Every structure is written in C-alpha cells, then in structure tokens.
Amino acid sequence: MTTTVGIVVKDGVVLATDKRVTAGYYIAHKKGEKLWKIDDHVAATMSGGVADLQNILSFLTVRAREYKTQFRRPIPIRALVNYMSLILFYSRPYVYVVHSIIGGVDEEEGAVMYMVDWLGTVTKEKYVATGSGSPYAKGVLEVGYRGDLTVEEAVDLAINAIKAAIRNDPGSGEGIDVVTITKRDGFKRIFTTQQKLLIPEI
C-alpha cells in the first residue's frame, strides 16, 4: 500500500511518492525511500513488494552502467523499460508483486515516462498514479494536468496529488519525496516549502 505519481512536461519528468511503508495494516516504517535513481537521466518509483523491486531496480542500475561503459552514452529509457518487462514476463509462474513508474530524459524521446506492472505490461504515460492511494491522486492529476505545465507547476501538482492520497488512504502517509529529471539538471531531489509544511497541515 502506497502512492506514487509521475508527470511528464516539456522540459522533464516529475516523480513523487509518499513515505509510509506498510505490512498489511501495520505501519512498518515511516521514512521509506520509494524513489530509485537508476542513472543521472532516469529514475523509478517503487510500489508493491519492496524486496522484489529493490532486486529488479538493482538489475536496471547495473544494466545502465554497463551500457554507458560500452557505448559511451546514457542508456535509452525505453531499453531499460523493455529489460524490466522481460524480467517480469519470464519470471512466470513466479510473479513479482511490483508496479513501477520509470521516467526521465534521453536523446531518443526527450522527456518520457512509462508504467510497468507486475505482469510486464508497459504503457507510455503523460501522467499516472500507482498504489493504494492512486484513485485519490489520479483525480487530482486529471483536473490539474495540462500539456503546457512547467516543471515547477508539475512539482506542485504532484505534491497535491500525493497529499490527497495521504488524506484519504490509510496505506499512504508520513511525508512526500519528489524528484525532477531534466536535460539541464539531470536527477534532482526537490525540497519545497509546501513539502515541508505538508505534515503539519494534515
């Protein structure tokens, strides 16, 4: 149970998550890290089985480094997504209980984001939410998303989407992590005034 959000804008991608880690109805951790830096130009969110996703995203991180060493350039994001999809597809009948948003900026597609589900299904998205709080977050995204959003506006929208989930979903809570991936700055963690004030408000 969790909430993760991704938004694509012209200049980059914004990813955001809550920080609550649950085991059934038990709050197992209050400072969970659900954002994973794969390389300077790409990151992923984690929703579902933490151990499964940590294992798979470790594979992706190593693959990205191997590609950069071999070809002297960052790995295309679609290649990473395809690699994850193959891992999930060929793991059957064992199923990894995972859901991930992978997004960033590359030379082939510019700012781009994909969602990968536990069966290996891949969908290209402009905005998306996963996890138990996704119905609440998705509603905020549906109302607030525009094609001409700036990165800063997308950060605010992502925070508001996670905020709605925290207010309504018992599986989400404790705080918000936000990262941006842009061509100019690469991977960057965001700490905004709204983010810092979020917990007292709730």
From Swiss-Prot:
Enzyme Commission number(s) from the entry: 3.4.25.1
Keyword field: Autocatalytic cleavage, Cytoplasm, Hydrolase, Protease, Proteasome, Threonine protease, Zymogen
Signal peptide coordinates: none
Catalyses which reaction(s): Cleavage of peptide bonds with very broad specificity
Pfam family name, one: Proteasome
Entry GO MF terms: threonine-type endopeptidase activity
Protein purpose: Component of the proteasome core, a large protease complex with broad specificity involved in protein degradation.
Quaternary structure, from the entry: The 20S proteasome core is composed of 14 alpha and 14 beta subunits that assemble into four stacked heptameric rings, resulting in a barrel-shaped structure. The two inner rings, each composed of seven catalytic beta subunits, are sandwiched by two outer rings, each composed of seven alpha subunits. The catalytic chamber with the active sites is on the inside of the barrel. Has a gated structure, the ends of the cylinder being occluded by the N-termini of the alpha-subunits. Is capped at one or both ends by the proteasome regulatory ATPase, PAN.
Family: Belongs to the peptidase T1B family.
Name recorded for this polypeptide: Proteasome subunit beta 1
Gene source species: Pyrobaculum arsenaticum (strain DSM 13514 / JCM 11321 / PZ6)
UniProt lineage: Archaea, Thermoproteota, Thermoprotei, Thermoproteales, Thermoproteaceae
